[in-house]
Amino acid sequence: MENVHNWLALASVGLSGQRYRQLSEHISLTELVALPASTLQQIGLTQRQAHGLCYEAASWVEQALQWQAEAPDQHLITFEHPLYPPLLKETRQPPLVLFVKGNAKLLRLPQMAMVGSRSPTPTGRKVARQLAAELTYNGMVVTSGMAQGIDSECHLGALEAGGQTLAVLGHGLRQIYPSSNKRLAAEIVQAGALISEYFPEVRARAEFFPQRNRIVVGLSNGTVVVEAALKSGSLISAQLAVDYNRDVFAVPGAFYNSQAAGCHYLIQQGAKLVTSVADILEERALFVDNGLISKQEKNVTLDLCSQQLLDNVGDDPIPADLLAERAGMTVTDVSITLLELELVGKVAVVPGGYIKVGST
């Protein structure tokens, strides 16, 4: 519990995971939070950070612990917590604490980020829902930012397909923005999770939303852009994915559709063109080859359930949610086990679900 207090204290002053890693080479977590303000400034913290850590952090820590205690589905995932996403930890500015409401275990499952316009065309909305649904059928968690437009459509597509989805918010979890998404947020909590790096009481501010995007992308194996203008923030998300060495996918549109101009630009720059979910699934093997599915995820024990799942997989594609129903398992457990079976060559992911391959 002491370490949780310390992580929260550092997070309350905006210290990033990158900066903490640098400091941790010379000083322990416990020693760091106990330093006087003058020494904190000498080792590189700003005056504001040093003052906050010494004189204001305790109230933020108390607030966070109170929020966690209010409900069993409210979690504090610190930088050293076993559920902290390894892909996010690899990025340049990982948050020291994630506030999670919902199923925190989903943080460790393979994810696909989906982003796009806040004012999409009807076609864009339809494509976003369909792609999100098909990704969940094939064992991926859909991750987005719960903004109006494409973000919301992606979450809805995953939910309507019986899949799992994560929403990364640009504010604390005691509020929902936009307020029109309160019902969607409640549904996401039931079948996924809301995530934020901001303390629960922190209200939405314009500058928080670009920061939120680095987490959406950082959590994910790849990023799909569905409708984006040339000056869209989605292009920033795509550039982040490139910086993180993750795949970028873009859905093309009509040449006269200004909302597709950003996607066309991304394709010209080397993003993978998406005409169906198969174009995304073809890259799934690369996630493993490039190390984008972590070693920790590969170490999940299969002894009790792998054969049970294999008995329900044949030559015809079967989606993960139907496998879960037949095997009497949760979709989360099925997704983890299917990933393991895929890595050892027992099953393969194809459009429509999973098929059995190799000898059993």
Provide a role label for each language-model segment.
Residues 1-3, 71, 78-360:
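Glycine-biased, small-residue-rich flexible motifs in mid-sequence functional cores and linkers
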Residues 1-82, 344-353, 357-360:
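Short, small/acidic-rich helices and loops at N termini and domain boundaries
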